[in-house]
Amino acid sequence: MTSVAVGYCGLVSIIVITGAAGVIGTMLRPRLARPDRTLRLLDIAPLTDGVGAGEEYVQASTTDLAAMTAACEGADAVIHLAGVPGEVSWEAILELNIHGTYTAFEAARRAGVPRVIFASSNHAIGFTPRSRFPVPDYTFPAPDTYYGVSKVVAEGLAGLYHHRYGLDTICIRILTCFPEPPDRRALSTWLSPDDAGRLFEACLTAPSPGFRVVFGVSANTRGGFVSLEEARALGYEPQDDAEVYAASILAADPDRDVPDEDYPPLQYLGGRFTFPDLDALLSLASGGSVAQWWLSSSSWWMRSRHTAMQTMSASFWPCATSTP
C-alpha cells in the first residue's frame, strides 16, 4: 500500500503520541495541550492519571502495524516515544525499539501523516569523546549500547521516510529528561520538562523542516556538550538551567572535588553507558545483587551506577510501554 503524505498546512490539530504513559509522554501531555488540539495517546499500558480533556486513549502496541495505522488516521503529526528506554537484551531491543519504530514510520506513511518526531538519544553517539564537545548536530554514529544502536537505526529510518516518501522527520537526541536532574552529570545534560515541551512544540510547528537531527537539552550553565544550532533553527529557545539544583546534588556527591575534566561520567557523551564494565554491572543490577555489588565496591563510579539504576528502576523503566 502506498500513501503520499500531505504537505504542512500550519495547523497541528491531532497529534499521535506513542508511549504516552511513559515518563516523557506524561511530562509532554500538559505542555502540548491546546484548546484546538487533540492528543491521541497510544500505549499498551493504561494511563495512570486517566484521559483528560482534549485527549484520546488508544491501547495498542507499536509493533501492531494495523492498530498503529488506524491510530494515525487523520493525524497531523506523530511523536514516537515508545520503546525500551535503556539497555536490555538484543532480542527486546530488536522487537520493540527497531521493529516498533519501523512500524510507527510505516503507519504514519500509510495514513498520510506528514510529520514524525522521533525521540532519539545521545546514546546514538555515546562514544563521542569530551575532546569533541560541543558535539555537532549531525555527528557520525558512535553508539554505546544495543539501545544506542536502535536509535541509530531509527534515525536511518527517519532519513529514509523523508527522502523516499516525503515525510518531515525530526530526530531529537535527548540527553537527560527527568523532572529534576538526577546526578552531577545531569547538571550538564538536563532537558527540563518545560524545555522538552518547548522543543517538541517547535518541532511540531516549524514549516517544512525536512529531515533533521537536533539535540534536546536545556540552557544549563554547565552545558556546552552539544550544539543547539539545528534546534534553534526550528524555533527552540531553552529557558531552564539545571544549576538551580547544583548545590544539593554536589553536596551529596562523594566525588564533588573531582574536576569535570577528570570525572569519568563526563568523558564521553554517553556517560556511564561507556564504562568498560557496563555488561557486568547491568547483570548484577538486574539479577538482584545490587546490595552485594554496593557493599563490595568502594569506587565512586559503581556508587554512581547504582544511583542511576535506582533512578531508572523507579521512574524510567515504566516508559517501556510498547511490549506486545
Regions found by a protein language model. Name each.
Residues E55, A60-L96:
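NAD(P)H-binding glycine-rich loop region in Rossmannoid oxidoreductase-like domains
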Residues T103-A142:
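Conserved Rossmann-fold NAD(P)-dependent oxidoreductase catalytic core, especially the SDR/UDP-sugar
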Residues V213, T221-E237, A251-D279:
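Conserved C-terminal active-site "lid" loop/helix of NAD(P)H-dependent oxidoreductases
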Residues I15-R34:
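N-terminal Rossmann NAD(P)H-binding glycine-rich loop of SDR-like oxidoreductase domains
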